[in-house]
């Protein structure tokens, strides 16, 4: 299923501000980090760097013993040794997207009309300038070799440990990943599963299509990095900033971008740059930031 929060409903009535007041919308999470990148806060000028390689990865999976499967498609851009990625709905990318990226300057791609290109470009840039190292706060965990299901469960255990479960009653899960729900169940945690596509979980629980409508029913939020790619991260961030609720992100999309939001609404990140666990039966790495008991 596509991990995503549903867009907020439009207001039914406008509030007119006084003539002397100016209302300025807060920048989106993407714009906040991208503007810092353009200003040189993270390293070299993006205008001086070009993407050498663009590719997509598509997969379909249904693990043994599971009643449900899913499909994924990911756009990835390579900048020197770094690969930046953004998941998309299968078939969503237009035919010319890869050609747009190859040889293009990073600063140009940060303004590309496709959100997936913008996110993948920023992710590649930050993966190049801010790799996941202990000096930058990352705790690298190597997932052991195994089947896709074994590695999925190992990743889920690491991600769930980033939540302060002893302090929360119910977790809003934005992006249905069965191994994460399975880990929460085994931890005794209550959860509210949410995904734009709705449906039911592996255990027959209803999946809520509108995550924003359930924000007041949770004590913590566990969300996929795909929310950065489809633009639905911002209301989750706003809620976490306002309420102080833990917001933990598990990210293949934007894995180098989302750690830049730690302390600004985000309490922990599991960052998983390409190649992802499902591509390789051997050991692969997660980079963990923040998290645990507060």
Model-derived segments and spans:
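Short, conserved loop/helix-junction motifs that constitute active-site signature segments
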Residues: 166, 215-216, 238-244
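NAD(P)-binding Rossmann-fold cofactor-contacting core
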Residues: 188-201
């Amino acid at each position: 299923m596509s991990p995503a929060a549903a867009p907020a409903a439009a207001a039914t009535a406008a509030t007119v501000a006084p003539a002397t007041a100016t209302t300025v919308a807060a920048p989106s999470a993407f714009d906040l980090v991208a503007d810092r990148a353009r200003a040189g806060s993270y390293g070299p000028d993006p205008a001086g760097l070009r993407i050498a390689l663009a590719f997509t990865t598509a997969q379909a999976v249904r693990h043994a013993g599971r009643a449900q499967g899913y499909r994924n498609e990911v756009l990835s851009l390579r900048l020197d040794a770094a690969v930046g990625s953004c998941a998309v709905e299968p078939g969503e990318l237009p035919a010319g997207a890869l050609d747009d990226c190859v040889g293009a300057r990073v600063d140009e791609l940060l303004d590309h009309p496709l959100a997936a290109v913008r996110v993948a470009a920023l992710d590649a840039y930050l993966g190049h300038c801010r790799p996941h190292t202990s000096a930058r706060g990352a705790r690298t965990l190597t997932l052991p070799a195994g089947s896709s299901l074994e590695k999925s469960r190992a990743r889920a255990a690491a991600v769930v440990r980033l939540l302060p479960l002893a302090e929360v009653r119910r977790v809003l899960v934005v992006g249905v990943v069965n191994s994460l729900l399975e880990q929460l169940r085994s931890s005794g945690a209550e959860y509210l599963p949410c995904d734009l596509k709705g449906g039911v979980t592996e255990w027959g629980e209803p999946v809520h299509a509108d995550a924003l409508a359930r924000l007041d029913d949770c004590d913590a939020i566990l969300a996929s990095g795909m929310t950065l790619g489809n633009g639905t991260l911002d209301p989750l961030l706003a809620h976490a900033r306002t309420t102080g609720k833990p917001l933990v992100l598990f990210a293949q999309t934007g894995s180098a971008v989302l750690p830049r939001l730690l302390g600004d609404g985000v309490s922990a990140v599991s960052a998983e740059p390409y190649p992802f666990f499902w591509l390789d039966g051997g050991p692969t790495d997660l980079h963990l930031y923040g998290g645990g008991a507060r």
